[in-house]
């Protein structure tokens, strides 16, 4: 065992080692967060989860580190991994392109310093004169502080910079930078003063309010020039690592040891991938297009385990990937949710099967507070499977139904027309609708605006439904939650609004239907087929299908109405609850007629005649979806039109930036949170950002199958706030330190230096 690793990982917290002359040396805690560009480091994060320790193991490579040092860091990381039982998740980190998880370990940010062990660096003497240093501050939550060449040529007006001149530390705020960037810049300047100058330097803020003399004082430190000489906002591609593409190909590669003891690799599949492709006896490499995972089977050989990361490096070199491409090593039965999400199906232990989303106890409490008859945690696995299949997505969004009211209108010639209340719940696949739902919370009215888009609705109608929804929200002063609903993927609350009386018919006005009042009689041949979905009286719905055998599914219940009979067809995989819901649907779509119950396999000729004859149909049960954990992203559109995604690991409410649009992926639904300070273009493109996020999502989710909700700052529903570890509704009014507050504290701190 490496002596420096003795006792490693036994207690919670962060531990860092540096590679010095090919040896592992403990790194001083007071220097955590400072990394020399010429060095390599090993970073271990230990946490206690319900009494069990778990580990994330990172090895960090500076941009100027030697190949030998980098190799030593990788080898020693494997040794530490073995010491911890081979279960840590390993991460390869490269300077400037670290994972958000790594950056989140350092609350004051990460600072890159020139030099290293091999170059003979020395500790800073706070009383000794030394040349000026310029730092580029990037990131709003995960801060990177990179040392750059001193001079105005290294600066731009869209970012913030720190100029360290010894007795003065200047914080330059680019005119185009945002308030959150500026706040982080001051926070980054304070450690430079405290750590490098023993608190004896003054911090001087250079922004639009700075005097000419203050701005001029920094010019000598920059080697001449003035703020006017600084380049415009950077529009380069330095954030390309965060850009997501729709065309990334996800591939799976087998890593194995052949009969001669030589490690081999070969590609075994492309997306869609199945969990069954992974063999416990071997190792596998998953190439996601933006990063690489190495999966270690529990029965793989020691050589395969040791060589797998080395092979990953060779694979990336062969593919021409950048050296900073993220690599993670995961072990069987301890796969993170992000890894499992790349597979179309993933069998979890029965007690872990969920609705596609992982819930904390706090989130469960928020759900049960609004819908007391629904408690997922108490359900048997088979019941949870039925809920996953029938209850509809976004089931956490279930506000209290009491005293609620609704207004429904379809789009006719791209205009909203009211729907007669007696026909609420009847939808046509050729139309789009807007539904306004009003409910009360603590005596105050709250609103949800649904825009429902039929599968056969025209693109103009779909676009118009979104426009009308925005208009209605504006009339409500931005207080509504906007929810896009695609036919067949209605959220649980949307279904419950109609209390079991929802029917989706084929066609629409443009398709030649007479009108909605003829729904129970109009059909050219007197034959109609409906698929039944639902778990209780409140969420049952009937979806009309094409009258052919191929529309049937063994996992479901169907209602077949013919001129002479009405059949209730029970698939072999259907539950008793689904059968009961089917009987209620018969009363709804085919009232006043005798019902004939037919079990799958016992159909008569008249039944098949109504479907145009026997035919093949789906008989296999859909497999379980992998559990997905909530994730928060800061999303922007780059000047080139690409989606830039920056994930916030271990996120909290404080990560919701007032100046930005954020995307919260709950694992079930996707929320678009619009900050009050976001610009008009970002507000206008909020839904587009979420749609692009889903399109570039490497999992099997599709745009149509994912519910998108748009919410404004200050109007967050309980389903949204419950995803966060804690929520303070007054935070933005009095809970956060603003840039102006932080700036006002600077003179007070400087006064103590004099």
Swiss-Prot record:
Ca(2+) 1 binds at residues 430-431, 461. Induction: Interaction with actin is suppressed by PIP2. GO terms for biological process: actin filament severing; actin polymerization or depolymerization; barbed-end actin filament capping. Signal peptide: none annotated. Residues 1-120 are annotated as: Actin-severing. InterPro entries: ADF-H/Gelsolin-like_dom_sf, Gelsolin-like_dom, Villin/Gelsolin. It comes from the Eukaryota. Keywords: Actin capping, Actin-binding, Calcium, Cytoplasm, Cytoskeleton, Metal-binding, Repeat. Residues 210-220 have a biased composition (Low complexity). Gelsolin-like repeats lie at residues 22-71, 143-183, 266-306, 414-463, 538-580, 643-684. Its main location: cytoplasm. GO terms for molecular function: actin filament binding; metal ion binding; phosphatidylinositol-4,5-bisphosphate binding. Ca(2+) 3 binds at residues 659-660, 682. GO terms for cellular component: actin cytoskeleton; cytoplasm. Residues 68-71 are annotated as: Actin-actin interfilament contact point. It is found in: Cytoplasm, Cytoskeleton. Residues 209-238 are annotated as: Disordered. A 1,2-diacyl-sn-glycero-3-phospho-(1D-myo-inositol-4,5-bisphosphate) binds at residues 101-108, 133-141. Ca(2+) 2 binds at residues 556, 578. Belongs to the villin/gelsolin family. Calcium-regulated, actin-modulating protein that binds to the plus (or barbed) ends of actin monomers or filaments, preventing monomer exchange (end-blocking or capping). It can promote the assembly of monomers into filaments (nucleation) as well as sever filaments already formed. This is Gelsolin, cytoplasmic. It comes from Homarus americanus (American lobster). The lineage of its organism: Eukaryota, Metazoa, Ecdysozoa, Arthropoda, Crustacea.
